[in-house]
Amino acid sequence: MTTTLPRRRGRPPRNSAEPRQDTRALLVRTGVAVLTEKGYSSVGIDEILRLAQVPKGSFYHCFESKEAFGHALIAAYADYFARKLDRWFLDTATPPLQRLRHFIADARQGMQRHGFARGCLVGNLGQEMGALPESFRAQLEAVFADWQARTAACLQDAQRAGEIGAGHDCAALAQFFWIGWEGAVLRAKLQHSAAPLDVYAQGFFQLLK
């Protein structure tokens, strides 16, 4: 005769991996927020743990080192930003150059919302590269290359729509955009003003005429 055990009341037991994943996600979110404001070299693990309210032992369950944590932050920010670019650049109901203007306006509003304290995590790390683990270099370059490719595709749409001349090299324009945009973001943080973003955007669109 088989005996059926009574079903326990309440929620089913959680998988032991779930709390670890929750903690990891919290640490990554906290780290991304901090590193859009401060440099990697100036931020210690203790600051991240204090802000996230996570014990140090839990950090090392999720990441082998601060370097491994840094790689996770770059990957998370790259994924977030790629989705942001796609939201604007793949909006086929909007003319291509207007998509780029919408992205710029959204970024401008984001910087204003945070009092110009936050910038670009990838740009911040790029400026620090001389003091960072060498393993970050290729990852950061790959992120910029991805952003440039998405921007080039939007500019190619603009070219096909006759918004910019056929003689323009869209890949080169996209590279130029990101080199200049990162500088404009840096100046906006420095000046606590959207003026550098506006000056750069105006100059870039003038270049396309």
Residue ranges and their predicted role:
Residues 98-99, 113-135:
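Amphipathic alpha-helical segments used for helix-helix packing
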Residues 72, 86-118, 170-177:
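Hydrophobic alpha-helical connector segments
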Residues 26, 30, 34-68, 72:
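Helix-turn-helix
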Residues 75-81:
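Short, basic, alpha-helical segments at the C-terminal edge of helix-turn-helix-like DNA-binding modules
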Residues 132-138, 144-173:
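Hydrophobic alpha-helical bundle segments that form small-molecule/ligand-binding pockets
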Residues 1-22:
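N-terminal intrinsically disordered/low-complexity leader segments
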Residues 110-114, 153, 157, 177-194, ...:
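Amphipathic C-terminal alpha-helical segment
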